[in-house]
């Protein structure tokens, strides 16, 4: 009777999960989930609402806000990064760039009206005279990207994606059940720390590349069963290396 009851229970649970938008690929994965002792989570689009909005534009000397946004939107239309959609939407109507190339974890570049435009993180592009302003925005919980035109710094754009309201309670519940929670993000340490504080997450790993996330998750998995929750192509290696 037990041999029959267990599969039925698992199938029933998998069916119930689909009603909440959760797709479980196999009963084995469902069973492994019960033994998870460590949860690694991405920030953007996972802990946050996935409704990013442009909240600040800072133009460098000789440029203006509208120019900076238009150039950034032209190349970000081609990006798969969760925050790119916010910039593209804010600059709606901007012609798309040509000859676009994206490097995961760094940024994206292309030709806009014959000018070479690049949009990327402050780790990839030097903030120069805008460094102090960028750091202030990051400390407020905004994610900043820098925009260059023909190799010259044109400006910075701040994007904010609010924390999902249920996250603090979920983190507390997991901790009460003996599950450690860690944040893994490619974002800067200031923005990550600001959001982690709101979420109640104490273990924060920021400024990570996709391979860094995969390495950290592999390390977690060596000591305890680990689940990874992520979003986007940047998290694919880490997702593949997790227990679930």
PLM regions: where:
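Conserved catalytic phosphorylation-site environment of P-type ATPases
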Residues: 2-75, 218-222, 230, 238
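General structural feature for long, well-ordered alpha-helical segments within catalytic domains
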Residues: 10, 32-35, 53, 83, ...
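Conserved ATP-binding TGD loop and adjacent catalytic N/P-domain core of P-type ATPases
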Residues: 24, 114, 133, 141-143, ...
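Cytosolic catalytic regions of ATP/NTP-dependent phosphoryl-transfer enzymes
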Residues: 38-128, 142-154, 188-197, 234, ...
């Amino acid at each position: 009777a037990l041999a029959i009851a267990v599969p039925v229970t698992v199938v029933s649970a998998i069916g119930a999960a689909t009603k909440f938008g959760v797709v479980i690929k196999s009963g084995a994965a469902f069973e492994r989930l019960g033994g998870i002792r460590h949860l690694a989570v991405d920030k953007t689009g996972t802990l946050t609402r996935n409704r990013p909005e442009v909240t600040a534009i800072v133009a460098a000397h000789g440029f203006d806000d509208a120019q900076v946004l238009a150039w950034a939107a032209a190349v970000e239309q081609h990006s798969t990064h969760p925050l790119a959609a916010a910039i593209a939407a804010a600059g709606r109507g901007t012609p798309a760039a040509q000859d676009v190339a994206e490097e995961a974890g760094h940024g994206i570049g292309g030709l806009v009206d014959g000018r070479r435009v690049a949009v990327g993180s402050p780790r990839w592009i030097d903030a120069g005279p805008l460094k102090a302003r960028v750091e202030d925005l990051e400390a407020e919980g905004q994610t900043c990207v820098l925009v260059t035109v023909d190799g010259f710094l044109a400006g910075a754009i701040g994007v904010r994606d609010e924390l999902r309201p249920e996250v603090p309670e979920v983190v507390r519940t997991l901790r009460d059940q003996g599950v450690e929670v860690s944040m893994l993000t490619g974002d800067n340490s200031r923005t990550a720390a600001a959001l982690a504080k709101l979420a109640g997450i104490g273990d924060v790993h920021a400024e990570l590349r996709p391979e860094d996330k995969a390495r950290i998750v592999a390390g977690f998995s060596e000591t305890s069963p680990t689940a990874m929750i992520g979003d986007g192509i940047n998290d694919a290696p880490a997702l593949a290396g997790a227990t679930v």
